[in-house]
């Protein structure tokens, strides 16, 4: 008999009841988490653990970044979507470079950028929920787009 653990059930409930903005925040947090785990892999002395930890977790972060890219709505804010697409493509290339060469710097760079994006998204989500809106507006999205154009 299958009995899901309570934490898994809680997580599933959180995903199913989350707003679109909260789901995006969860994706950012997941990407940050997997990149942090991949960076821990650089501390492994065993070559197999070193390579597996980095590779598997970088690939998970890349999959999340591709999902973030798929969530963009070009019809609502084409300029923002183009900027974010370019940024996510850059993140994907840098993660791939760090994974292939097994170097920390490109992975750490993506992590720094994801922290900024996640924190900005979290702030916008909080402001929107305080204002009583259930989703972010294109104007809010443009604020992130303006940041991405300067980085």
Give the residues covered by each predicted segment.
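Acidic, low-complexity proline/glycine-rich segments
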Residues: 1-11
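Short, charged, amphipathic alpha-helical segments
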Residues: 52-55, 81-85, 107-112
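Preference for long, well-ordered alpha-helical segments
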Residues: 104-151
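Short, solvent-exposed, charged loop/turn and helix-capping segments
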Residues: 67-82
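Short helix-adjacent coil turns
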Residues: 45-49, 98-105
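Alpha-helical segments in soluble extracytoplasmic regions
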Residues: 42-68
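Amphipathic, well-ordered alpha-helical segments in soluble domains
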Residues: 27-37, 57-67, 87-90, 94, ...
């Amino acid at each position: 008999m299958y009995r899901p653990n309570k934490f898994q059930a809680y997580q599933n409930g959180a995903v199913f009841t989350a707003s679109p903005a909260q789901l995006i925040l969860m994706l950012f947090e997941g990407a940050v988490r997997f990149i942090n785990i991949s960076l821990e892999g650089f501390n492994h002395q065993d070559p197999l653990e070193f390579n597996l930890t980095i590779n598997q977790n970088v690939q998970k972060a890349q999959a999340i970044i591709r999902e973030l890219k798929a969530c963009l709505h070009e019809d609502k804010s084409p300029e923002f979507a183009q900027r974010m697409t370019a940024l996510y493509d850059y993140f994907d290339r840098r993660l791939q470079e760090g994974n292939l060469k097994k170097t920390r710097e490109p992975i750490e760079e993506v992590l720094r950028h994801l922290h900024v994006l996640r924190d900005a998204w979290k702030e916008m989500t909080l402001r929107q929920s305080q204002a009583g809106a259930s989703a972010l507006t294109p104007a809010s999205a443009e604020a992130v787009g303006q940041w991405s154009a300067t980085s």
